[in-house]
């Protein structure tokens, strides 16, 4: 058994359809020989086939990571190759789930995940457009300080504790985003759209009233 990396332009025209079928053959289904050979989905050998693109001279690549089992082929990446990765934190359903509604949802998630990367949106499970400075984010976090609570203790003990709990790295703005996401998830706020940070804050405040 070996991996086959082929180019459409190098294939005889009467083999193109067979090779497209071969690239999507899933071993849980009954396999049929194509051209006298058995093939299986290339994702079982390399879930992110960057090697084929790099060896064919592509320098700027947008790679989409999809969660699941599989192997990533390791090879030396040339210094002049730029790769932008798009990944998701959402549950996309099973590989063999052919439900139309799930497929439409996955497509929508894909667009949102791409926008997160390409437009610099914030959030892990929500898609948030930034409008606040780091100082404004800190002030908003300080607004949650209860009357009489020690300010230094809040900044040096409580906020770092929250950051660790929410796995929030970076500055105060990123900590605020993690807090907002946590609150939004608990309140069942829809995450299938883009929010401006101030809009999400207002949405959460309205939900508490």
What is each PLM-predicted segment?
Residues 1-209:
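Patatin-like phospholipase
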């Amino acid at each position: 058994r070996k991996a086959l990396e082929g180019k459409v332009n190098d294939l005889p025209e009467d083999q193109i359809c067979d090779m497209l079928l071969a690239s999507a053959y899933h071993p849980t289904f009954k396999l049929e020989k194509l051209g006298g050979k058995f093939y299986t989905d290339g994702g079982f050998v390399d879930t992110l086939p960057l090697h084929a693109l790099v060896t064919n001279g592509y320098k700027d690549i947008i790679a989409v990571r999809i969660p699941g089992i599989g192997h990533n082929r390791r090879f030396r990446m040339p210094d002049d190759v730029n790769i932008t990765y798009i990944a998701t934190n959402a549950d996309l359903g099973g590989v063999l789930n052919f439900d139309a509604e799930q497929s439409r949802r996955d497509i929508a998630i894909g667009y949102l995940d791409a926008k997160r990367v390409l437009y610099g949106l914030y959030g892990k499970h929500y898609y948030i457009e930034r409008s606040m400075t780091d100082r404004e984010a800190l002030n908003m976090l300080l607004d949650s300080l209860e009357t009489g609570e020690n300010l230094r203790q809040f900044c040096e003990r409580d906020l770092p504790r929250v950051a660790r709990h929410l796995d929030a790295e970076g500055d105060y703005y990123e900590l605020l985003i993690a807090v907002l996401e946590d609150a939004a998830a608990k309140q069942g706020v829809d995450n299938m759209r883009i929010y401006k940070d101030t809009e999400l804050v207002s949405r959460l405040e309205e939900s508490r009233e």
